[in-house]
């Protein structure tokens, strides 16, 4: 998908690579000192760590991208991506409709910060709240 806003394009391209999953390509969109924080406050130093974390939590997972929202600041752009996750849990059962919200900071053409929130933890703890 093509976007007029450069920061949104960078985030979109990163998400495409990370969902492939291609952590090597995904890392090319991130600064060397990127700060990645996942649900539960889990800090991850690299895109490879995201792939490893997801491999432990899901058999496989993809994003159904929703809209992108962004706001420019003096030295960076904040980009929000929202939508839903779908895939399979480690036991092979499928899921969809798992809400996510990712927040990115993009500076000088690179993602410098990524914050991730989704419903996975709640769905794992209480599977009955997951809606097909």
Question: Residue spans of the language-model regions?
Answer:
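Mid-chain, well-packed structural core segment of small domains
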Residues: 69-91
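Hydrophobic pocket/interface hotspot
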Residues: 14, 25-27, 34, 46, ...
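A solvent-exposed, acidic/Ser-Thr-rich amphipathic alpha-helical stretch
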Residues: 4, 23-77
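Short, low-complexity N-terminal intrinsically disordered segments enriched in polar/charged residues
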Residues: 1-28, 32, 130-132
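Low-complexity, intrinsically disordered terminal/linker segments enriched in charged
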Residues: 113-132
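Hydrophobic alpha-helical core bundles mediating ligand binding, dimerization, or RNAP-core interactions
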Residues: 11, 15-18, 30, 50, ...
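Exposed beta-sheet edge and beta->alpha loop/turn motif
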Residues: 84-108
